[in-house]
């Protein structure tokens, strides 16, 4: 979704990851992802170099036997579990690509570790007028 000309809503999540020093990022796309893929390829703002990790995009494998797209975030994660397992990362951040927000994921990770949590969900109260 374009915002202010050349920006996309996903830029906020990716910028948050860059600013939090996250090096390996996977983007799970759905149908009609051509424009998004072009944007991701042409943008060098995030500095996800292959030497440090990289930016990976995944589209669901639609076949004659499996004719459905991702059925939500959990399904996207499940269909790409091998990538997660092979990444050898101790923690995973799952962020929506359609939110406009600024967040330091390091603070969330510190909280997550301190609480010895299996998972941590971050939410925000939004006033009705907003």
Regions of interest found by a model, annotated:
Residues 1-130:
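Unchanged
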């Amino acid at each position: 979704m374009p915002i202010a000309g050349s920006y996309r809503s996903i830029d906020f999540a990716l910028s948050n990851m860059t600013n939090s020093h996250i090096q390996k990022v996977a983007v799970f796309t759905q149908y009609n992802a051509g424009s998004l893929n072009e944007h991701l390829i042409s943008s060098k703002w995030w500095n996800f170099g292959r030497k440090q990790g990289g930016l990976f995009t995944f589209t669901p494998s639609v076949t004659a036997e499996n004719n459905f797209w991702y059925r939500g975030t959990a399904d996207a994660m499940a269909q790409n579990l091998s990538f997660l397992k092979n990444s050898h990362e101790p923690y995973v951040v799952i962020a929506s690509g359609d939110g406009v927000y600024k967040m330091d994921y390091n603070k969330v990770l510190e909280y997550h570790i301190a609480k010895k949590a299996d998972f941590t969900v971050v939410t925000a109260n939004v006033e009705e007028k907003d």
